[in-house]
Amino acid sequence: MATNAKHENGESTKGKKKMSAKKRRAKQRARIIIFVVELLVIVVMLVAVLKVFQTTEEVEGPQFAQIDESQIVVNSEVVEKFEESEELKGYWNIALFGVDATDGQIRKNTRSDTIMIASVNQDTGEIRLVSVYRDTYLNLSNDRYNKCNGAYSSGGAEQAMAMLNMNLDLNITDFVTVGYDAVVDCVNGLGGVWIDVDKEEIKHINNYQKSILRDTDIDDELIMVEETGYQLLNGLQAAAYCRIRFTAGNDFKRAERQREVIQAMADQAKQSSLSTLTDTFLQVMNNVYTTIDQKDLQDLLGQIANYSIVGEDGFPQRDKLATENIGACGSCVVPTDLADNVVWLHEFLFGVEDYEVSSTVQECSDQIKADTSPYLNRRSN
């Protein structure tokens, strides 16, 4: 059995250390925020924050997170690599969480329906997005293995970031979380998003619209999608589109749709006026939870156009995963070789060829194989 599993004596994984106080953040913060704006709608609205705060002192902002840095685990070898490697300098990584909560309760006790990693090259302005499939079988950062979306439910953004760092050799300490009603309000505020809808998706968009209206306090008008092709979707329709999973591609296609909507929102935001962004921000801010504070927002204006999304993909890679019922965990996406997937991830995000994974990632990879092989082998026999 791999040594990173938690034993009865409480011994925990080796090769990791707690993240110390954030270093050299002042120069990087503004660019981090700008790329977040490029990535997620809500954050796009943050462009308007400066204007809002300049005109009134009565406006409340988003829920700013005071995170416990001691809970954000970063593998010790990774800390050294990001500080010393020339290839890794100039990058900043952020976690994006979409939670299935619509009443402002977005901090904890809800599973992250969407998990993304956004990596920005601060020298070139290039941004890459990776969806981590929510049912991926990973170490939840406490040496317990289950579907990765359980990390947010158990320990909020701190544990979810720690989970990503531990399994993927990353150094994430910033995040943005949004609820589904923020997506609805944001898309509506931007005037909709342009999406190419196929025949198979129409019925699911309409069914999910009905379920969202039934199960949440969102009171948008139900407008049925009736035609295929490239068309302007409103907020409710776009949120429903993001939730489709029962088509060819299942959750993998669902994650692709979510990235597609993010790109469409970023495109709309770039064409929007400051007044439109301000109005949209006021609509969604109560459903945004983030480490980005008011002071950092002041560097946003006039720089958004310098950043663009140049690549997007999913994790694990389609040729490096399997789907199977893993005991009490239920149906999971299994990275058949986590270490191999992490090697691919670092080449995709940072251009690092033949990346050498940390001992922690290798231990997690070995443990995942030990846990899942009996189930995967049974299927192949």
Give residue spans per PLM region.
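Entry/capping segment at the start of metal-dependent catalytic domains
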Residues: T3, K16-K17, A21-T124, D299-A305
